[in-house]
């Protein structure tokens, strides 16, 4: 396990260096480690927690969650086996990036082929299971589109709206769709942390509908405003939204949301605002 971890750390370091050195390519799939670790620490995953990243990239959130569980708890043999094989789930649309994710997890002694969905569009289908925790940084880019070939043989991009009966609004906005998808992935009392750009906070129409329903159906307790430039794409204004899925009997008028602007990402962010999950140890089939 230790030897695997050393090789894994070297491999992850190479991924991070490539993300820093490349304007396109790995950088679009790599979330800065300091941000990942801060989010994971305040979320406080426990042994037995079923965790999914529906836009996994190279697997940084899942690796960090596993690392924090191993560091914070003394696990017995069954708990270690569960963490290695049943606790972490990844979905990644880009097949080559999914292979990087699989290698990253396997070099750290984590995951298996059943837990990594490669080349799958998270947004295309309603979830077949629910999870205790969702940690994710969906790819930035406002609109979803598909490339088609027209009669002249030219490639044309067309806007793609996601039609799902578990979504509150139909829209081509990828971030709004990911936000709705994350809510659908959660068990009752499950918890989520999702990185989102500013357009999700202020867009009208479908954006307003999604925000109202999220505030009504979930406990949206914390919004962390990130400093500009934390991502490799310059000028991107981003936020981390923390929320818990409430039982239907507890839906009510929205409670106040705690908001902060962080000049420096540290592991102490909002630790008093987050509550441990009361959900069971594994994904629930639906």
Predicted features by range, described:
Residues 25-136, 140-145, 150-154, 176, ...:
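Conserved S-adenosyl-L-methionine
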Residues 6, 31, 96, 174, ...:
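A generic structural signal for residues located within well-ordered alpha-helices
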Residues 18, 69, 83-85, 280-284:
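Charged, low-complexity, helix-prone segments enriched in Lys/Glu/Asp/Gln
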Residues 125-286:
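A conserved structural/catalytic subdomain of Rossmann-like adenosyl-cofactor enzymes
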Residues 23, 53-56, 186, 231:
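Short glycine- and Lys/Arg-enriched binding-loop motifs that mark or flank ligand-binding interfaces
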Residues 1-47, 113-122, 225-229, 250-255, ...:
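Non-catalytic, mostly N-terminal accessory regions of nucleic-acid modification and defense proteins
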């Amino acid at each position: 396990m230790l030897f695997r971890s050393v090789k894994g750390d070297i491999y992850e370091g190479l991924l991070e260096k490539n993300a820093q050195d490349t304007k396109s390519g790995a950088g679009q799939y790599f979330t800065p480690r300091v941000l990942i670790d801060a989010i994971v620490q305040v979320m406080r995953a426990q042994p037995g927690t079923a965790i999914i990243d529906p836009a996994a990239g190279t697997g940084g959130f899942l690796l960090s969650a596993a690392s924090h569980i191993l560091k914070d708890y003394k696990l017995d043999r069954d708990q270690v086996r569960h963490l290695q094989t049943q606790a972490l789930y990844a979905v990644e649309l880009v097949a080559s990036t999914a292979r990087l994710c699989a290698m990253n997890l396997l070099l750290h002694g984590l995951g298996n082929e059943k837990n990594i969905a490669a080349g799958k569009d998270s947004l295309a289908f309603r979830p077949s299971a629910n999870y205790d925790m969702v940690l994710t940084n969906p790819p930035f880019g406002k609109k979803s589109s598909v490339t088609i070939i027209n009669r002249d043989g030219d490639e044309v991009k067309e806007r793609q709206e996601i039609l799902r009966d578990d979504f509150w609004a139909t829209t081509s906005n990828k971030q709004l769709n990911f936000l709705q998808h994350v809510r659908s992935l959660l068990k009752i009392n499950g918890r989520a942390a999702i990185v989102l750009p500013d357009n999700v906070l202020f867009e009208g129409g479908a954006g307003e509908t999604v925000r109202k329903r999220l505030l009504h159906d979930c406990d949206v307790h914390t919004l962390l405003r990130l400093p500009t430039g934390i991502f490799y794409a310059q000028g991107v204004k981003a936020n981390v939204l923390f929320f818990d899925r409430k039982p239907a009997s507890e839906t009510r008028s929205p409670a106040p949301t705690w908001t902060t602007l962080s000049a420096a990402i540290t592991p102490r962010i909002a630790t008093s605002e987050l509550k441990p999950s009361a959900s069971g140890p594994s994904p629930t089939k639906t």
